[in-house]
Amino acid sequence: ELPAIQNLGAMDVLCCDKTGTLTEDRIVLERYLSTDGNEDARVLRHAFLNSFFQTGLKNLIDLAVIDRADVTPSTVVPDSMLGQSLRDRYTKVDEVPFDFSRRRLSVVVADAQGKTQMVTKGAAEEMLEICSFVEIDGIAQPLTDEKLAQIRKQIAGLNAEGLRVIAVAQKTN
């Protein structure tokens, strides 16, 4: 198309939709990482609980999380996908809706034994501001300045790859 090629000379910026967000109206969950940078099913589990049980319109990120959990095998329920396993084992108790000043959304869920947990998902920087502990190898530890710097460096690296980083945190009652 000669006219299209001629127009390229007049362009200052060319934007490409390499992820399909604009052209396909969808997002794909690429990674679910713990604070040490390793893939961690607990991160996907908490993100799923938040995305699935929130009552508002599900945005593209929520749908990507739900889709990924629906094709990821459960480590708890044999011959089951993670998403279905979590749907069957948890019920929603309460919700703090997303708002643009907090830049996060929280849901409270309960398991069959009545044990509750609040799961919050939101913009990484805002989430880091409200967290005082970090889970390392399944153990909650104080979020030190050194660990915070390491997490921020990890986020910057992911952003440099063109990935949008969302953080998820949980607090068990």
Predicted segments — roles?
Residues E1-N173:
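Conserved cytosolic headpiece of P-type ATPases
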